[in-house]
């Protein structure tokens, strides 16, 4: 499939926003000369009307559109009953319900050929990616919609061409169905997102180097070993849940003590000490800083919730 952004919604005005409907004739030429299917982003009913009249094969809805249920509903109504393939990118913010809601609106408009595009999520925390993967969100999406085709957009996720291959390999290992990768004959001079573009030759090399793994293996030794290791995981998970439950009981006792002594729930000095210690412990156990921060922030929030419940009781 040949992908091109005809209309390019940008975060801020003044940047290249695509050449507009003029490019629809170029897409027709691409299809005629290569035999490839064509796809572009649509953001309103007018885009849809022009794309359909010019025989664009696949339409995708961008991340900035997915966040708005009103616009999604307008687009779904404009496409009602179409047999075209419609791909929905994840919303900018890491909100599975918002993504699911957009997909459901297209299903409700009698559109059957639907897929999802994972392009990563914006975050205040600095990471090496332009948009953080948050793989767990797409794992949850696959669990809720197991038959929904899922495509990775490593270009927008990475923001840098040197990170694209590893993201693609991870996606394959997580049973993704394909990729949407930006290519350019002269990436450094591309009019938009030049750092994330790769050449067609680089794309060919990338696809040749990717390893497609089997979904499973029926070998008896493999299955026996796997089941044994999974049993160990189950034991550790149960211990983890019990430990967390016991930790919350201690947090409740602390909450009761604070209530009796009229002390605020949140103690920033203590929280900073916990984080610093756990980051050191995590590093020794080869756990990433990102994981430790997310894990203990979640634990801390749950502890606060338990203490608040204690303090609110008469």
How would you describe each model-predicted region?
Residues 3, 17-19, 35-44, 57-71, ...:
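Catalytic beta/alpha-barrel core
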Residues 3-21, 185-194, 254-265:
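Glycine-rich, proline-tolerant flexible connector loops at the mouths of alpha/beta enzymes
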Residues 12-17, 37-42, 62-63, 94, ...:
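Active-site mouth loops of central-metabolism enzymes
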Residues 15-23, 63, 67, 94, ...:
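Alpha-helix N-cap and loop-to-helix initiation/capping positions
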Residues 56-57, 177, 237:
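Receiver (REC) domain switch/active-site residues of two-component response regulators
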Residues 71-205, 209, 215-221:
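Catalytic alpha/beta core domains of metabolic enzymes, predominantly
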Residues 215-314:
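Domain-level signature for soluble enzymes in the chorismate/prephenate branch of the shikimate pathway
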């Amino acid at each position: 499939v040949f992908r091109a952004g005809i209309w390019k919604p940008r975060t801020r005005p003044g940047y290249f926003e695509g050449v507009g409907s003029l490019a629809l004739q170029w897409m027709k030429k691409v299809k005629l000369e290569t035999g490839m299917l064509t796809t572009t982003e649509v953001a309103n009913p007018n885009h849809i009307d022009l794309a359909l009249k010019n025989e664009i094969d696949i339409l995708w809805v961008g991340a900035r559109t997915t966040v708005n249920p009103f616009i999604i509903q307008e687009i779904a109504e404009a496409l009602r009953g179409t047999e075209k393939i419609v791909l929905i990118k994840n919303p900018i913010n890491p909100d599975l319900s918002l993504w699911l809601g957009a997909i459901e609106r297209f299903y409700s408009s009698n559109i059957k050929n639907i897929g999802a595009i994972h392009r990563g999520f914006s975050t205040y925390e600095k990471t090496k990616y332009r948009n953080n993967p948050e793989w767990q969100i797409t794992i949850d999406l696959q669990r809720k919609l197991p038959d929904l085709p899922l495509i990775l957009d490593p270009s927008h996720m990475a923001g840098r061409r040197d990170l694209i291959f590893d993201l693609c390999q991870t996606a394959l290992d997580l049973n993704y169905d394909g990729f949407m990768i930006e290519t350019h004959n002269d990436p450094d001079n591309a009019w938009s997102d030049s750092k994330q573009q790769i050449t067609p030759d680089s794309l060919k090399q990338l696809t040749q180097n990717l390893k497609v793994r089997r979904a499973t293996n029926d070998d008896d030794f493999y299955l026996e070993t796997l089941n044994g290791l999974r049993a160990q995981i189950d034991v550790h998970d149960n211990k983890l849940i019990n430990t967390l439950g016991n930790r919350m009981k201690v947090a409740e006792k602390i909450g009761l003590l604070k209530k009796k002594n009229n002390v605020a729930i949140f103690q920033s000095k203590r929280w900073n000490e916990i984080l610093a210690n756990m980051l050191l412990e995590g590093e020794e156990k080869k756990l990433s800083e990102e994981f430790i921060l997310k894990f203990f922030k979640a634990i801390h929030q749950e502890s606060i919730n338990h203490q608040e419940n204690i303090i609110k009781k008469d």
